[in-house]
Amino acid sequence: MNRRSSAAGDTERSEAVQWIDRSIIVCLFLFAAAAPHSIAATQTAWLIGMLLWVVRFAFYPVPVFHKSPLDYALLGFFILTGLSAFLSYEPMVSIGKLRAASLFTIVYLFAQNIPSRRVVRLLALTLLASCMINVLYTAGQRLVGRGVKIQGLTVGSPLYAAGVRPGDTLLEIDGQKLNDPEGLINLLVIPNKQPAALKAYRLENFPTFKVERGKLLAGSDPLERLGVEGWSKGRDWRASGFYGHYVSYAEVLQLILALTVGLFVALPAKRSWIGALLTIAFLGFCFSLVLTITRASWGAFLISSTVILLLGAGRRAILIVGLLVVPLVLAGLFFLQQKRNVGFFDQTDNSTTWRQTVWREGFDLLVSKPRHLLVGIGMDSMKGHWREWGMFDNGRLPRGHMHSNLLQLALERGVPALILWLVLLGLYAVMLLRLTRDLRDSNDSRGSEQPLGPWIDRGIVLGALGGMIGFFASGLVHYNWGDSEVVMVFYFMMGLTLALKRLVDLRTAKT
């Protein structure tokens, strides 16, 4: 009787373990599918997956925790981050930011729970396929356009008197979206002493103009009454996908583009339907990245692609790509000049000059006290103390962060934390280089021509390495480590490669 009860209990535990393990895998795929689109959905998948993983430890057999070369650096960096939070000028604010810092557990959720190399490959392809959805969305937005772009304006126009100029795209009036000039007329003819609030887009800015009502010109159609000489749909804004900001979108695209390039370089038969699909994805991601008009991410993409080609492609392929890149770079520079009215390296650009200002202020604050060098000022404590520290040109510049991973980490968490972060990236790069070599030198060529063959493993590693280097390069002028959407994709790639290393090492040990 006891044996039967014990057997029944073992069966129930076995079924529960299988259910939990499968549910964790589902969460991993939901994470990969949501990462290019929604921070809320991605973090929900992460939290549910983490909860299930913790519950899994309550059942026999207890999961084995596999060590990795990055464990000490990851945990040490988080510990130093926590220490800086508790010693912060604003402890409660900084401690609240530890939730974002705990996103590093994404690495372990993937690294410890992926059961096979096939799942690694499917997760990487899920990320790519899902990202194509926001590429189509971005293309659809451009095709449809938005608002009313003013092509010409008479001096006597009530819009001109309010400050509107040719080239502006009118988006909303009194909170209502504009689709055509008739929408303007309908609200400007209403008798009201209060002027209408007209929101517009002008070269990255969203000014609001106060337009007096009842000042329309005489005319037989809306354009004549508004003093507008011509209009079209606006298509000038910077693409942001489903995110709220174009920089987040650009940085995520850079990481996913690196994965795409890595897979294509590793693909044995490039003239195949798989090669065609990867080419389509590559062109789509490039299209969206260009529309973000984000110089640092463009440069990061070029750097990451160069690294991947040097490590994975032959000389002939590198030469061909190099020749193709030149016209693309020139076209990108022209597009940048047309859409943002700046050059790639432009000392007259406001975003460049105020970066230089906050870098100087941040460095001065960092070295002003030994405490700042050791443990930093604490995450987000600057929001409550920028006035007393005279930051952001005493409030005349946009208040936010230091626009550099290196300076931001040193200032908020201390120089030791920055050093450990650099060690983490260095160890990660070394691991990826060794894994690339191991996969290249392995004798496992069986199935290399299959859609889900071993070539994908090498492509993932090449993409992760290139993406990491591009991420670091872009982070010299962006604080992309503080962007959760970007960091989650970065940790996702790190988790995939750690899982792949574990599975490759296990196979090697068996042989």
Task: Provide a role label for each language-model segment.
Residues 233, 346-360, 373-413, 434-436:
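Long extracytoplasmic/lumenal interhelical loops at the membrane interface
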Residues 1-93, 105-106, 112-121, 125-128, ...:
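Transmembrane signal-anchor hairpin modules in multi-pass inner-membrane enzymes, especially those
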Residues 185-229:
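PDZ-domain C-terminal substructure recognizer with occasional recognition of PDZ-binding tails
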Residues 129, 136, 140-146, 283-286, ...:
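A membrane-periplasm/extracellular boundary helix in multi-pass inner-membrane enzymes
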Residues 144-180:
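PDZ/PDZ-like domain segments forming the peptide/carboxylate-binding groove
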Residues 260, 264, 272, 413-469:
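Hydrophobic transmembrane alpha-helices and their immediate junctions
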Residues 48-54, 258, 302-305, 317-318, ...:
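Transmembrane alpha-helices of multi-pass inner-membrane enzymes
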Residues 240-248, 394-432, 473:
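A conserved mid-to-late transmembrane alpha helix and its immediate loop/hinge
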